Curated annotation (Swiss-Prot):
Cellular component annotations (GO), alphabetically ordered: cytosolic large ribosomal subunit
PANTHER family: MITOCHONDRIAL RIBOSOMAL PROTEIN L24
Protein name: Large ribosomal subunit protein uL24
GO biological process annotation, one example: translation
Keyword line: Ribonucleoprotein, Ribosomal protein, RNA-binding, rRNA-binding
SMART domains hit by this protein: KOW
HAMAP family per UniProt: Ribosomal_uL24_B
Keyword set includes RNA-binding: yes
Organism of this sequence: Thermotoga maritima (strain ATCC 43589 / DSM 3109 / JCM 10099 / NBRC 100826 / MSB8)
Amino acid sequence: MRIKKGDLVEVISGKDKGKRGKVLRVIPKENKVIVENVNMVKRHQRPVPQLREGGIIEREAPIYASKVMVVCPACDKRTRVGYRFTEDGKKVRYCKKCGEIIDKD
């Protein structure tokens, strides 16, 4: 999976098409990601004394990774991600449109 936690992604299909958000969690076994303010669902929550109050809460639900694309921080366009090795032998992700390195490390 070429998407990592903290990446800025854009939804390319579905009811939230065009929305951008930060990846909060990656679920590789299910090939899904949870994106900030995308695919919001309402959940009924029971009250737990001393911990939280009950009611209806809104939270993000997982979305298939194939429905999102990484947004390049340099060119601000959604792009495919490639891998290359730097001079010191480190494997990094790069934008296939502009060639800039996506990983901040």
